[in-house]
Swiss-Prot record:
This is Methylthioribose-1-phosphate isomerase. Belongs to the eIF-2B alpha/beta/delta subunits family. MtnA subfamily. GO terms for biological process: L-methionine salvage from methylthioadenosine. The lineage of its organism: Bacteria, Bacillati, Cyanobacteriota, Cyanophyceae, Synechococcales. Keywords: Amino-acid biosynthesis, Isomerase, Methionine biosynthesis. The record marks 145 as: Transition state stabilizer. Pathway: Amino-acid biosynthesis; L-methionine biosynthesis via salvage pathway; L-methionine from S-methyl-5-thio-alpha-D-ribose 1-phosphate: step 1/6. The gene is mtnA. It comes from Parasynechococcus marenigrum (strain WH8102). HAMAP family: Salvage_MtnA. The keyword Calcium does not apply. PANTHER family: METHYLTHIORIBOSE-1-PHOSPHATE ISOMERASE.
Length: 337
C-alpha cells in the first residue's frame, strides 16, 4: 500500500492527513484558515515535529491570502505545540522572508512554504540513508512513538530508517512501544510499517526492559522534538526510560535529529519547555473512563534524555557522536532551504 502524504497544498487551502482517525480511516482535513491549522496542530490531527513545522508555514500562507495579521498568526501557531523546535524554525524562516514584509506577497510566501516542504523531504531522505548505514545486517530495532513518513513531509526519521533498512535487507524486525497515552506506536507506527510490509510487534511501554534483558533488541532508534546545544534530547515521554535501560544492557541508543530539530540557543534540556496535555488523555480513552473516578493524572507530553545516554545523533549532515556541544556548534544550521 502506498502511504498517503502528511499534507498537501491545493493552491487556496491546506489538506492535512487526520492522524487522529488512523488506522481505521484515511481522511484529510480541508483547512482554509490559519486558525484551523493551529487547532489541527494543538489537537494532534497532524503530528511529528517536521510535519507540524511545514503545516504551520502553510498556515502563514493562509493568513496572508486572507490579508490577516501575520504577527498574530505566527504567534498563535508557535504556541500550538511549545516543545517541538521545528515549529518555530519554520515560522521564523517564513516570517523573515522578503515576501512577509509589507506589502505582503502571498504567492511569495507560498513559494517559501513549498521550499520548506521540499527541504524536509531532502533532509529526511539523507538522514535515513545515514541511519541505515549504522545498523548491522539482521538488526532488531526498538522504536518509541511515531516518526514515520506521515510525521514529516518526506520519508520519516527513525521509522524511516527502519523502513528503508528493511527494504535494503538490514532490519529484520521492529519492536514498537505502544506509546501511552495517545498510542502513536500502536496506531500510527504499526499501521505505517504494516503498509510497507515491515515485520513488527507492538509492546506495552513497560515491556521494553524485559525485551532488552532477553537480548531481543540490537538497537534503540527514536526521533526527537528538540536537541539542545549540549546534546540533551526532548522526545516523547518514555524516551528517557528507554535510554536508561538501553545503557544498562549495552544497547546503542540512536536519536534521529534533522537540523530543523536542533536548537543551539537552548543550553541544555532543563531549559526546554515541556508541554503538558489534558489529564483526560490518561484517564479516558475514546470517551470511556479508564481511571478511578476522581483520580488525578499528570500528562507531560515529552521528557528529556541527557546527552550522555545518546550513543549518536543521526542527522542529514552525518552521524554525530559525543562530545556533542562542539559538533553541534559546527553544523551549518543557518542555511536557508
Amino acid at each position: 500500500m502506498t502511504l498517503p502524504p502528511s499534507l498537501r497544498w491545493t493552491g487556496d487551502h491546506l489538506e492535512l492527513l487526520d492522524q487522529r482517525r488512523l488506522p481505521e480511516e484515511v481522511s484529510f482535513l480541508k483547512l482554509h484558515q490559519w486558525r484551523d491549522v493551529a487547532e489541527a496542530i494543538a489537537t494532534m490531527a497532524v503530528r511529528g515535529a517536521p510535519a507540524i513545522g511545514v503545516a504551520a508555514a502553510w498556515g502563514v500562507v493562509l493568513a496572508a491570502q486572507a490579508n490577516e495579521d501575520l504577527d498574530l498568526a505566527v504567534s498563535v501557531l508557535k504556541s500550538s505545540r511549545p516543545t517541538a523546535v521545528n515549529l518555530g524554525w519554520a515560522l521564523d524562516r517564513i516570517k523573515a522572508s522578503p515576501a512577509a514584509q509589507e506589502p505582503v506577497d502571498p504567492q511569495g510566501l507560498a513559494a517559501v512554504a513549498a521550499a520548506l516542504e521540499a527541504d524536509d523531504r531532502a533532509r529526511t531522505q539523507t538522514l535515513v540513508d545515514h541511519g541505515v548505514g549504522l545498523l548491522a545486517s539482521g538488526s532488531r530495532v526498538l522504536h518509541h512513538c511515531h516518526t514515520g513518513a506521515i510525521a514529516t513531509a518526506g520519508v520519516g526519521t527513525a521509522l524511516g530508517v527502519i523502513a528503508a533498512g528493511h527494504a535494503r535487507g538490514v532490519v529484520r524486525h521492529a519492536w514498537l512501544d505502544e506509546t501511552r497515552p495517545r498510542l502513536q506506536g500502536a496506531a500510527l507506527s504499526a499501521w505505517e510499517l504494516g503498509c510497507l510490509g515491515v515485520p513488527c510487534t507492538v509492546i506495552v511501554d513497560g515491556a521494553s526492559g524485559l525485551l532488552m534483558r532477553r537480548q531481543e533488541v540490537d538497537a534503540v532508534l527514536v526521533g526527537c522534538d528538540r536537541v539542545a546545544a549540549n546534546g540533551d534530547v526532548a522526545n516523547k515521554v518514555g524516551t528517557y526510560n528507554l535510554a536508561l535501560v538501553a545503557r544498562a544492557h549495552g544497547i546503542p541508543f540512536y536519536v534521529c535529529a534533522p537540523g530543523s530539530s536542533m536548537d543551539r540557543s537552548t543550553s541544555d534540556g532543563d531549559a526546554i519547555t515541556i508541554e503538558e496535555r489534558p489529564q483526560e488523555e490518561i484517564t479516558q480513552h475514546r470517551g470511556q473512563r479508564l481511571a478511578a473516578p476522581g483520580a488525578a493524572a499528570w500528562n507531560p507530553a515529552f521528557d528529556i534524555t541527557p546527552a550522555h545516554l545518546v550513543t549518536a545523533l543521526i542527522t542529514e549532515f552525518g552521524v554525530i557522536r559525543p562530545p556533542y556541544r562542539d559538533a553541534l556548534q559546527a553544523l551549518p544550521l543557518d542555511r536557508q532551504p
